[in-house]
Amino acid sequence: MKSNIDKQAVKNFLLQLQDQICQQLEAADGQAQFIEDAWQREPGEKLGGGGRTRVMRDGAVFEQGGVNFSHVFGEQMPGSATAHRPELAGRRFEAMGVSLVMHPKNPYVPTSHANVRYFIAEKEGEDPIWWFGGGFDLTPFYPFVEDCQLWHQTAKNLCAPFGAEIYNEHKAWCDRYFYLPHRNETRGIGGLFFDDLNEWPFEQCFAYMQAVGEGYTQAYVPIVEKRKNTPFTERERQFQLYRRGRYVEFNLVLDRGTLFGLQTGGRTESILMSMPPLARWEYAYQPESGTPEAQLSEFLVPREW
């Protein structure tokens, strides 16, 4: 598996993907632009490297969102990582990726998340250990069946060239991963999720990661365009803020990437970029039966689209 590994090609793609996604989301918003915060790790820190954090605020469509590129490296993996993968002990490592979350203002536009990443751990005289990961998922507040079908059909189409079962496997993985056991519900309607992908040749794994990265806006932008001008009232806004609380719960309690980043001295501002600007909690809230708010629960279980 050592041959044909091209770290620079992966990095070049990720930088270009960040540019492309930002341009497409700015066009969908029509008003706000991403502000870039380029950062570098200080010498002597646990991790070296840097990245480009891009944040959009107070747009016509997006209340807040971020599209982050990072490329970090270290001389050895943290103990939290090698406990489950002892073969990584004593290896220097690099991790690079693009991660994004968009929180729309209009409750009829779903929140979306996407991430693609590459990891490699190397040691003199031994084959490198590498893998790709990523995916995208959608969190509607007032879901429409046709939007969910478009989202999943886009995912299914991009998976098709890589194997008949890839969509089913990575959809099911997404449903399992974005699940809140303390609420007994999924975070949203899912999409794709994969990790530790290295069983194919490097070029094929890289091509799949590229397809997933580029598939995000193909799936999301048409939904944004369709829903962004839907009228809404304070009632829908309050429900959106309440449901955003679930997003916060998942990210701070369950998300592996958030926990890993905070435990390993990652850049806190970039890690917490995924948080919504406003959210609320209400004790023992139950939506009135028969209302659109009550219907959301029907979508928060794994199902075929």
Curated annotation (Swiss-Prot):
Cofactor(s) needed for function: a divalent metal cation
What keywords does the record list, in alphabetical order? Cytoplasm, Heme biosynthesis, Metal-binding, Oxidoreductase, Porphyrin biosynthesis
* Gene Ontology BP annotations: protoporphyrinogen IX biosynthetic process
A GO term for molecular function:
protein homodimerization activity
In this chain, the stretch annotated as Important for dimerization covers 247-282
Q: Which residues does the Swiss-Prot or TrEMBL record annotate as the active site?
A: H113
**InterPro entries xrefs:** Coprogen_oxidase_aer, Coprogen_oxidase_aer_sf, Coprogen_oxidase_CS
EC number of this enzyme = 1.3.3.3
Keyword Transcription regulation part of the UniProt annotation: no
Instruction: Sum up the protein's function in the record's words.
Output: Involved in the heme biosynthesis. Catalyzes the aerobic oxidative decarboxylation of propionate groups of rings A and B of coproporphyrinogen-III to yield the vinyl groups in protoporphyrinogen-IX.
Q: What is this protein called?
A: Oxygen-dependent coproporphyrinogen-III oxidase
Species this protein is from: Vibrio cholerae serotype O1 (strain M66-2)
- Gene (UniProt): hemF
